[in-house]
Swiss-Prot record:
The gene is Cd3g. Glycans are attached at N66. InterPro entries: CD3_esu/gsu/dsu, Ig-like_dom_sf, Ig-like_fold, Ig_4, Ig_sub2, Phos_immunorcpt_sig_ITAM. The chain crosses the membrane at residues 117-137. The keyword rRNA-binding does not apply. SMART domains: IGc2 (SM00408), ITAM (SM00077). This is T-cell surface glycoprotein CD3 gamma chain. Gene3D superfamilies: Immunoglobulins. GO terms for biological process: adaptive immune response; cell surface receptor signaling pathway; establishment or maintenance of cell polarity; protein transport; regulation of lymphocyte apoptotic process.
Length: 182
């Protein structure tokens, strides 16, 4: 049993190493992404040295035929420039690069100011909540007079009524539709 586990582990290690070696032997990535521009635009840069470079998006040409620029502006990142991009020269084609922007319309940037604002607002709200509980719990309730404790509200005879015997009314029997036996 132990030999099988060892053999399976050895097979897994060898297959992972082969995948790593195969990945390093591939052509280097020639397309670079610059998404940290001040205006919010996304810029692709091709590492080919050819004079004419064609840009491909999802396999179709998106650049003019005689384009000589090695950069391609995808536009604003708010327009969601998704797709698989490649640059193609006369002799060589780059590896495909998949661009995907996760658009978050309701996100906030977490920095020290935002976090401290959240903490400050939380402390203030807890303070006001505790103050409200203290003021409400600290109030004296309306005290009833002791005279009502000494009065008998109902006479003893009025508390209970005996069941009517030998009548077949709705409440003269205990279960379901069974009538009381005589």
């Amino acid at each position: 049993m132990e030999q099988r586990k060892g053999l399976a582990g050895l097979f897994l290690v060898i297959s992972l190493l082969q995948g790593t070696v195969a990945q390093t032997n591939k052509a280097k990535n020639l397309v670079q992404v610059d998404g940290s521009r001040g205006d919010g635009s996304v810029l692709l840069t091709c590492g080919l040295t050819d004079k004419t470079i064609k840009w491909l998006k999802d396999g179709s040409i998106i650049s003019p035929l005689n384009a000589t620029k090695n950069t391609w502006n995808l536009g604003n990142n708010a327009k969601d420039p998704r797709g698989t991009y490649q640059c193609q020269g006369a002799k060589e084609t780059s590896n495909p690069l998949q661009v995907y922007y996760r658009m978050c319309e309701n996100c906030i940037e977490l920095n020290i100011g935002t976090i401290s604002g959240f903490i400050f607002a939380e402390v203030i709200s807890i303070f006001f909540l505790a103050l409200g509980v203290y003021l409400i719990a600290g109030q004296d309730g309306v005290r009833q007079s002791r005279a009502s404790d000494k009065q008998t509200l109902l006479q003893n005879e009025q508390l209970y009524q005996p069941l009517k015997d030998r009548e077949y009314d709705q409440y003269s029997h205990l279960q379901g539709n069974q009538l009381r036996k005589k």
